[in-house]
A protein has these predicted regions:
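Short, contiguous alpha-helical
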Residues: 26-64, 110-153
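Alpha-helical membrane insertion/targeting regions
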Residues: 2-16, 27, 69-72, 76
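Amphipathic, well-ordered alpha-helical segments in soluble domains
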Residues: 9-19, 47, 81, 131-134
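Short terminal or interdomain "cap/linker" segment that borders an active site or interface and mediates
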Residues: 150-169
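Charge-rich alpha-helical segments
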Residues: 5-6, 10, 34, 83, ...
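Hydrophobic packing residues in well-ordered alpha-helices of helical domains and bundles
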Residues: 6, 10, 37, 41, ...
């Protein structure tokens, strides 16, 4: 179930980005505090990359993102990365493999927290949806010609709640 949700979120992103031009993808948007859609996408993609890097090393560190500017400026490259990450997720087993999460909230100290791959994949879905909501606002305000899936940037719990409300009325 978590794997399917992850793949669905990445497909939504891929489908949306396939409609954008490079100029739209890289344009600094006032409604996004002068960040671009590409910057939000890079941030999201790099979290997935940190997860898979951590899966191979045993320690995830989301602060150790590479901040690869190609992801925020080159749509073709980014679309290919999304496909590669989807492939990795699709081939991951739904096991709860133990892994450690390194967190650092100040300059001097860090903590190691025990977690597992599936828990972190759940976090990837929620984190992605959060950034997709911001991307959605940027597109709705600036690029009205882009078609946005009705569920893009909407939490699964909100989608279910809206469905329940529509059934009960």
């Amino acid at each position: 179930m978590t794997i399917n949700a992850s793949l669905s979120v990445l497909k939504q992103l891929h489908d949306l980005l396939a409609q954008l031009t490079t100029d739209e993808y890289t344009q600094k948007l006032p409604v996004l505090n002068e960040s671009s859609i590409g910057q939000h996408v890079r941030h999201t993609i790099e979290f997935f990359q940190c997860l898979f890097e951590g899966f191979s090393t045993g320690i995830i560190n989301y602060d150790a993102r590479k901040r690869n500017l190609l992801i925020e400026t080159n749509l073709g490259y980014t679309l290919q990365l999304i496909e590669e990450i989807s492939f990795l997720i699709n081939n991951a087993s739904e096991g709860h493999f133990p892994i450690q999460l390194k967190v650092n909230f100040d300059d001097e100290n860090f903590e190691i927290i025990e977690t597992n791959f599936m828990r972190e994949l759940v976090y990837m879905v929620e984190h992605s949806i959060h950034h997709f909501a911001l991307i959605r606002v940027g597109i709705q305000v600036n690029f009205k010609h882009i078609t946005i899936d009705s569920d893009f940037g909407v939490a699964y719990s909100t989608i279910r709640h809206k469905q329940e409300l529509s059934v009960s009325h």
